[in-house]
């Protein structure tokens, strides 16, 4: 588990857009995509589990992101694969809003942190 890192500020990511936080900045094994959609910030491993594509470059709608290569969809809330060709989900990461700052907790699953487990 890594320490939280400042990745931006509220308003830096437009609605249904994402930014990529490079693994070199987080110490985590994959780049992490931070999404803003439906009024919430969410983070997932950036690499699609089906092919080596950046999910941050995909199409974001509501609580889903669609891979730009083969149209696999993933839940922004749980990381679950929602349709083929992906059958394996991606990891979630906690994003915390502190004032107007966005803090990413690499390696801390979002649902676990939200549930307090």
Spell out what each predicted region is.
Residues 48, 67-70:
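Short cysteine clusters
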Residues 62-68, 81-90:
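Short cysteine/histidine-rich metal-coordination sites, predominantly Zn2+-binding motifs
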């Amino acid at each position: 588990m890594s320490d939280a890192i400042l990745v931006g500020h509220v308003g830096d990511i437009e609605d249904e857009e994402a930014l990529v936080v490079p693994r070199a900045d987080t110490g985590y094994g994959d780049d992490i995509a931070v999404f803003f959609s439906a009024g919430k910030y969410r983070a997932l491993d950036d690499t699609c589990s089906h092919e080596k594509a950046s999910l941050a470059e995909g199409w974001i709608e509501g609580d889903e992101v669609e891979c730009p290569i083969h149209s696999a969809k993933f839940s922004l809330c749980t990381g679950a694969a929602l349709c083929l060709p992906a059958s394996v989900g991606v990891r979630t990461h906690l994003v915390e809003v502190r004032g107007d700052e966005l803090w990413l907790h690499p390696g801390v699953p979002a649902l676990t942190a939200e549930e307090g487990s």
